[in-house]
């Protein structure tokens, strides 16, 4: 089992890092007492492949030797990577001032600045065990997430899932759509009696639409639009991209075009899912 340990200075972005790892498929545990790590690893190894835990100064052992012994014990059976997050003193002070949260070491006798300095002195030995040290001083949350993704090299897990979704405007817009394309202006198989009971998944409808220059031109332009901006969307730290194609009833045109777009990007090696939101309504109506 792979275990990622996220540690570092309070205010450096451990919570952001843990959310990122959760988004790419890690089972995450926040602020685990390090003494419980061997027990947790034993329990989770039966049904988890990738686990991430965050540690702050309150959960670390009092000596670096104890930490080293614990990590060595767990490494005998599992693959461990320690990621340490850092930021400069001024940035940590500003982040705490902006959030108005209390530093873990702050007491009535210890100011925020003194608490940050004390934590830095305590955590310095931990950096010697780190597989990766990230300075988040000038990083946005998206940039931090991308650094983590690149380090973990989980290309298949981090791949953006593109959902191509057909729907009927008569049933309303899909609430989860990032982009909506309206194809109600294209030639409609509904007005051809022999095609009316069929759907965009059926060969006669596909053959009819494939003969329409307007349909092919729309697919070409839409495909190019998506290809143009997809690299930026893939770098934008998102897990899903939902592209909805709508016609009047979600039965013919939108279904065919959704299939064409989805199959094209699947052939390009993208992580694609094809959905037809309104087809079930037509099938249900036909059985009644």
UniProtKB/Swiss-Prot annotation:
Disulfide topology: none
Keywords assigned: ATP-binding, GTP-binding, Nucleotide-binding
Protein name, entry field: Nucleotide-binding protein PM0169
Molecular function in Gene Ontology: ATP binding; GTP binding
Residues involved in GTP binding: 56-59
Protein role: Displays ATPase and GTPase activities.
Family: Belongs to the RapZ-like family.
Domain of life: Bacteria
One Pfam family it belongs to: RapZ-like_N
Annotated residues for binding of ATP: 8-15
Organism (species): Pasteurella multocida (strain Pm70)
